[in-house]
C-alpha cells in the first residue's frame, strides 16, 4: 500500500494534480488557500487585491519583524478597499472560492483531507467531489490501517479566537479554534495507526520556523495522545521551515510532510 501525503498546498494546483501519481490514495492536511506567497509576491489573494509592490512591502516588513508597521500597511490598504463600498469579506470569499474550484478539481480519487488554519470549512462541501472524503475529528480505514484526522489551528495570545475569523496584521485566519475544542477532536479520534493533523505536536524543534524565526503553535493534546495511544505515525504540516522535520516520540515517528507549495513533492507512506 502506498499513500502520498501533502500539506500547505497554498494554491499549488499544478503539482497537486500529479501528487497522487503512483499512489493508492492521497492524504491532504490542509491549507489549500494562498493569501500571500513570501517567495513570489505576485501570487495570492493579497497581491491580486493590492498589487505585487504592496505585497513585497508587507513581506519585507514582516521578515524584518517590523510587525506594527506591517499591520499599519495592512490597515491602510484594507481601509482603502472598505472606502470603495466593497465588503472585504465578500472579496476574500470570492477569491477563496476561485482557488477552491481549481484545487479540489486537482484532487485524485481517493483523497482524504482535513482543514488547515487558513481554510474555510463551510465552503468545502460545495467543492469536494465524490472521490474526496473530508474528515475532522474522525477516522477512516485506508489499506487496513486506521487514519485519524484533526484539522485547524490553535489560537494564541496574539491571535485571539473569534467566531467566524480572526485577523493578525489584517490577514484572515478562518479556522483557528480553542485548545479545548482541539483536545476534544483529538480525543474523539482515539487510538489510530496514523494520526493526521495540520499542526504539529507541542515539541519545540517541530514548532520553530527557522525562516520566520518564531515558534508556531503546536498542540499539547496531540503530544499527549502520541505518548498515550502510540500511533505508528504522527503526520502534520503548518510549519513551513521547521528546525526538525521528524522526531521520534516513543514508538511514534512524528513527521512534517513538507511545504507542498514550495516543494511540489508529497511525503510517501508505504506498508
Regions found by a protein language model. Name each.
Residues 6, 11-142, 257:
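Core catalytic region of metal-dependent phosphoesterases/phosphodiesterases
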Residues 139-144, 160, 223-228, 241-271:
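Binuclear metal-dependent phosphoesterase catalytic core
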Residues 1-4:
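Extreme N-terminal starter segment of soluble prokaryotic enzymes
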Residues 10-15, 33-37, 114-124, 155-160, ...:
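Active-site environment of divalent metal-dependent phosphoester hydrolases
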Residues 20, 104, 186-187, 226:
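Short hydrophobic patches on amphipathic alpha-helices
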Residues 97-98, 131-132, 211-222:
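Charged helix-capping and loop-helix junction motifs
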Residues 25, 192, 219-236:
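Proline-aspartate-enriched helix->loop->beta-strand connector
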Residues 36-43, 47-86, 145-212:
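Active-site-proximal loop/helix segment associated with metal-binding centers of metalloenzymes
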Amino acid at each position: 500500500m502506498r499513500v502520498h501525503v501533502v500539506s500547505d498546498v497554498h494554491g499549488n494546483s499544478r503539482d497537486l494534480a500529479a501528487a497522487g501519481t503512483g499512489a493508492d490514495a492521497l492524504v491532504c492536511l490542509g491549507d489549500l488557500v494562498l493569501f500571500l506567497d513570501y517567495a513570489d509576491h505576485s501570487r495570492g489573494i493579497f497581491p491580486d487585491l493590492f498589487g505585487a509592490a504592496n505585497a513585497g512591502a508587507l513581506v519585507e516588513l514582516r521578515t524584518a519583524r517590523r510587525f506594527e508597521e506591517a499591520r499599519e500597511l495592512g490597515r491602510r490598504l484594507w481601509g482603502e478597499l472598505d472606502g470603495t463600498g466593497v465588503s472585504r469579506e465578500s472579496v476574500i470569499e470570492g477569491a477563496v472560492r476561485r482557488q477552491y474550484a481549481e484545487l479540489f478539481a486537482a484532487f485524485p480519487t481517493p483523497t482524504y483531507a482535513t482543514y488547515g488554519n487558513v481554510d474555510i470549512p463551510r465552503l468545502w462541501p460545495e467543492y469536494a467531489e465524490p472521490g474526496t472524503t473530508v474528515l475532522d475529528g474522525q477516522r477512516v480505514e485506508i489499506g487496513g490501517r486506521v487514519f485519524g484526522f484533526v484539522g485547524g489551528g490553535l489560537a494564541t495570545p496574539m491571535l485571539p479566537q473569534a467566531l467566524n475569523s480572526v485577523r493578525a496584521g489584517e490577514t484572515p485566519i478562518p479556522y483557528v479554534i480553542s485548545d479545548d475544542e482541539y483536545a476534544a477532536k483529538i480525543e474523539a479520534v482515539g487510538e489510530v495507526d496514523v494520526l493526521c493533523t495540520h499542526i504539529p505536536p507541542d515539541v519545540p524543534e517541530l514548532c520553530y520556523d527557522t525562516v520566520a524565526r518564531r515558534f508556531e503553535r503546536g498542540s499539547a493534546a496531540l503530544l499527549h495522545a502520541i505518548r498515550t495511544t502510540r500511533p505508528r505515525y504522527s503526520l502534520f504540516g503548518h510549519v513551513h521551515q521547521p528546525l526538525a522535520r521528524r522526531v521520534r516520540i516513543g514508538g511514534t515517528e512524528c513527521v512534517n510532510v513538507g511545504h507542498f507549495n514550495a516543494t511540489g513533492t508529497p511525503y510517501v507512506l508505504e506498508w
